[in-house]
Every structure is written in C-alpha cells, then in structure tokens.
C-alpha cells in the first residue's frame, strides 16, 4: 500500500461499470481523506508533485470495454488482446498530447513528468511497461484492460475519464492502427513524441488542436481555455522566493 514517497500511499478504488460513478468515487475518496487528515491536524494533498525530489502523485485509470452481453471486447483469448484493444490504444495515443491539459491541469502538474520516476513523458504504449503512457497489464486475458498512466492526482476525474473514453472511441470508430508496443524503458527512446512538458505548451496544444473539437462540446473547450489562461497569467505575475535568492543581490 505504501508507495515510493515519504507519507505516500497507493489507493485502488473498486472497478465499476459506470464511468460517472468512478469519477464520483474518486472525488468522494479525496474529500474523505482530506477530512480525516484535518481531524488529526494533518494535511493530505493530491498535488501532482508536492516535493521536488520525491515521487509525484499519479491518477492511473484502468478501463475495460464490455459489449451488451457483458463480454470484454478487449479479450480475444490471446496475450496481445483484440484488434479493438489496439484501435483503442491508437486513439489514446493520437489524442494524448492534445488532451494533456486535462491530464495535467496545473503548473505543478508538469513537475511530475520527470524521467526515471515512472511518470510518462512521451506518447507510448506497451505490455506490462510501467514507463509507458499506456500500459496493458498482464494476467488473465478475461481481465484484459488498458491502464492510462498520464494523469496526476490533481486532475479532475470527470475530465480525465471523459478524455480517456473519447480517445478510445476515436480510435475504435476510425479503426486507427497502434504503432509497435515499446518493451524497453521509454525514457531511452529518443524517437518517441514527447508530451507537452510545461503548462503553457499544454494550453496552446489544447487550444490549437484539430481533434479536441470532435471530442468535447465547444462551450467546455472555450471555458477551460479561458480559465487556464487566466490561471497561468496569475502565476506568471508572481515572483518566487527562489528568484529572490538567486537574483536579488547577484545581478
């Protein structure tokens, strides 16, 4: 249960067949944890990177797809999974950079994307590869599923689930083909496309995307862009203590 960071814990929520309830459960869990911690004069945080030299906090989403009879359409009895699984993976990879703002919505979110910390920073997938952005876990083929590993714990669960589902649907409907899976450490693969690795780049990528308009309502897109630009402007106007320590007397 304990994770790499000091005072850090991994919590697995029960799988449910309703994405909205899954997001509700994530919000309720965060509220309960914060309330219990406060009663004991402690602070529980879901910042993506609360401590610069320790592990960040991720929000990994596991997703299966069932047909009307309850059969897992990602499973075809093989170790690799079905064609539909690979189409879904391809859709997630295609939309990943454009949706990074949803997976990493704050300035602090991008401190988590550090090579060597098991937080993905490129567009990649693989079987049992914990350095990839999209991982296909091993185990019983009947439980074949996709693990989306990009989001930080600070992300909005409703927007994350929406982006994951929309990406999978985009790939399935367009029958996109996934590239070859990565079996090595993805940080060492220089040819992989990197995600937007800073907040402003993610905002610009989301705003200029030719895919986002087909995934989300225009009102939501416009509002999110406006809010994030306003938030980014406020942070840009702040002078940090590190700047004072570095420059105040030395320039």
Predicted regions located by residue number:
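Short coil/turn segments at secondary-structure boundaries
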Residues: 1-4, 103-108, 216-222
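A broad detector of the eukaryotic-type serine/threonine protein kinase catalytic domain
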Residues: 14-18, 211
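Histidine-centered active-site/metal-ligand motif
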Residues: 2-3, 15, 60-62
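Active-site capping/gating regions of soluble enzymes
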Residues: 19-182, 187-192
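Short, conserved phosphate-binding/catalytic loop or strand-edge motifs used
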Residues: 3-11
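Acidic, glycine-enriched catalytic cores built around paired aspartates
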Residues: 186-251
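Short secondary-structure capping/turn micro-motifs that flank functional sites
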Residues: 6-7, 53-54, 222-223
